[in-house]
Amino acid sequence: FGSLLGICLLTQILTGLLLATHYTADTTLAFSSVAHTCRNVQFGWLIRNLHANGASFFFICIYLHIGRGFYYGSYLNKETWNTGVILLLTLMATAFVGYALPWGQMSFWGATVITNLFSAIPYMGQTLVEWAWGGFXGDNPTLTRFFALHFLLPFIIASLTLIHLTFLHETGSNNPLGVQSNCDKIPFHPYLSSKDILGFMIMLLPLMTLAMFSPNLLGDPENFTPANPLVTPPHIKPEWYFLFAYAILRSIPNKLGGVLALAASVLILFLMPFLHKSKQRTMTFRPLSQLLYWTLVANLLILTWVGS
């Protein structure tokens, strides 16, 4: 899935650059500039739909990639694993600030609710939120800085990816048995290159299908309404890939507790290398660990479903 993530990043940066050329980061113009891109720009609708749904595929790939790393004990390559978790956090930040850009109802309220979580930090919380917003509510300064961040972060992701790969290159890749694979090395081309191209096709075909036939399947209809600070949508919820964390946040009555649990649900990944106590690296021959692993997967799916 690593190669798929690379292709995702490339696609997102390309479509994103094309979108940025037609986008205006101003509260009065942002919504109509996106509408203009979809209506009047050559293939603007396709570029926008590919960019929006590409994010979903990016998250599908990264969750599968992490799950695979979990199952086969890849977290024992500590540097690779830690840079990977940092990559995940950066990706989440990028997706969050990007979702605010069309400045629809859900964009505005999602941004408001999530940035508001910083106010749970004792003493300095409220000041921090107002500093992040650039005012007393999400407004023009908020949108412009979110656009700047959304433009910058993917390039940071790209550079972190290089670091991630450099660390991986130190140890070489892992395999389902968790044994040395030096004797199994084969030329990259034509073997692995064709495997990668097959993966690209298997991913890009559903992406194109989704973008062409039902581009709004995963989006929220609230976002077709321009942002209005005076009207709160009936149910504020993030895109599906954040629902598990959002469900954790909302299930805890205390604000600070919820924020800590939300952060912990992702940051727990940093602890994985220290929690490995088995003599075997992978879960291939560890039925009990497998049971716990699939329980975790089921939990995440249930949380995602409950969060919606």
Curated annotation (Swiss-Prot):
Q: Which CDD domains match?
A: cytochrome_b_C (cd00290), Cytochrome_b_N (cd00284)
InterPro entries the record matches: Cyt_b/b6_C, Cyt_b/b6_C_sf, Cyt_b/b6_N, Cytb/b6-like_sf, Cytochrome_b_C_euk/bac, Cytochrome_b_N_euk/bac, Di-haem_cyt_TM
Q: Membrane topology for this entry?
A: Multi-pass membrane protein
What are the UniProt keywords, alphabetically? Answer: Electron transport, Heme, Iron, Membrane, Metal-binding, Mitochondrion, Mitochondrion inner membrane, Respiratory chain, Transmembrane, Transmembrane helix, Transport, Ubiquinone
Coiled-coil regions listed in the entry: none
Which positions are annotated as binding heme b b562?
51, 150
Entry GO terms, CC: mitochondrial inner membrane
Specify which residues bind heme b b566 according to the UniProt entry for this protein.
Answer: 65, 164
* CC cofactor: heme b
Which residues are listed for a ubiquinone binding in this entry?
169
Localization annotation:
Mitochondrion inner membrane
Q: Which GO terms describe its molecular function?
A: metal ion binding; ubiquinol-cytochrome-c reductase activity
PROSITE patterns, per this entry?
CYTB_CTER, CYTB_NTER
The note filed under miscellaneous reads: Heme 1 (or BL or b562) is low-potential and absorbs at about 562 nm, and heme 2 (or BH or b566) is high-potential and absorbs at about 566 nm.
UniProt lists the family membership as follows: Belongs to the cytochrome b family.
Tell me, how does this one assemble?
Answer: The cytochrome bc1 complex contains 11 subunits: 3 respiratory subunits (MT-CYB, CYC1 and UQCRFS1), 2 core proteins (UQCRC1 and UQCRC2) and 6 low-molecular weight proteins (UQCRH/QCR6, UQCRB/QCR7, UQCRQ/QCR8, UQCR10/QCR9, UQCR11/QCR10 and a cleavage product of UQCRFS1). This cytochrome bc1 complex then forms a dimer.
Tell me, in a sentence or two, what this protein's role is. Answer: Component of the ubiquinol-cytochrome c reductase complex (complex III or cytochrome b-c1 complex) that is part of the mitochondrial respiratory chain. The b-c1 complex mediates electron transfer from ubiquinol to cytochrome c. Contributes to the generation of a proton gradient across the mitochondrial membrane that is then used for ATP synthesis.
**PANTHER family listed in its UniProt record:** CYTOCHROME B
In Swiss-Prot or TrEMBL terms, this protein is called Cytochrome b
